[in-house]
């Protein structure tokens, strides 16, 4: 096999790995809401949202990868009323510091689930919400 053919084979293997890595996301494993069953649409337990098993009703929990990048410097001061339902599916990578200060008044059903490193989630100390 020539060097060029071997290099082409390696590039194709990397592309296939990239495609399947984005389509499948995280399956079983880790901890979080639902005992690590987020990959099967059971992210918030058997009750879930919408009467099904998790966010998407009875669909599978396979979401595409994030795939984007950018600088997201966001500063909010004052009163910020938020009404309605907000759902984020998939992975939201955060590199840098995330800080929240002040009281957070919430009414209704509020669920916050996820992983933050290294101070909370997965047995790394208390969860402060």
From Swiss-Prot:
<keyword id="KW-0677">Repeat</keyword>
<comment type="function">
    <text>This protein is one of many from the eggshell of the silk moth.</text>
</comment>
<feature type="region of interest" description="Right arm">
    <location>
        <begin position="113"/>
        <end position="129"/>
    </location>
</feature>
<feature type="region of interest" description="Left arm">
    <location>
        <begin position="22"/>
        <end position="64"/>
    </location>
</feature>
<dbReference type="GO" id="GO:0042600">
    <property type="term" value="C:egg chorion"/>
</dbReference>
<feature type="signal peptide">
    <location>
        <begin position="1"/>
        <end position="21"/>
    </location>
</feature>
<feature type="region of interest" description="Central domain">
    <location>
        <begin position="65"/>
        <end position="112"/>
    </location>
</feature>
<dbReference type="GO" id="GO:0007304">
    <property type="term" value="P:chorion-containing eggshell formation"/>
</dbReference>
<dbReference type="InterPro" id="IPR002635">
    <property type="entry name" value="Chorion"/>
</dbReference>
<keyword id="KW-0732">Signal</keyword>
<dbReference type="GO" id="GO:0005213">
    <property type="term" value="F:structural constituent of egg chorion"/>
</dbReference>
<comment type="similarity">
    <text>Belongs to the chorion protein family.</text>
</comment>
<dbReference type="Pfam" id="PF01723">
    <property type="entry name" value="Chorion_1"/>
</dbReference>
<protein>
    <recommendedName>
        <fullName>Chorion class A protein L11</fullName>
    </recommendedName>
</protein>
């Amino acid at each position: 096999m020539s060097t060029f053919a071997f290099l082409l084979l390696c590039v194709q293997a990397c592309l296939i790995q990239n495609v399947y890595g984005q389509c499948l996301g995280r399956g079983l494993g880790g901890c979080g809401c639902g005992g690590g069953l987020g990959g099967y649409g059971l992210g918030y337990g058997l009750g879930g949202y919408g009467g099904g098993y998790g966010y998407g009703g009875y669909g599978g929990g396979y979401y595409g990868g994030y795939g984007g990048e950018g600088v997201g410097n966001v500063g909010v001061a004052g009163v910020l009323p938020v009404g309605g339902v907000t759902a984020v599916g998939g992975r939201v990578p955060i590199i840098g510091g995330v800080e929240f200060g002040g009281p957070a008044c919430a009414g209704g059903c509020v669920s916050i689930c996820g992983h933050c490193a290294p101070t909370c989630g997965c047995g790394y100390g208390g969860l402060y919400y």
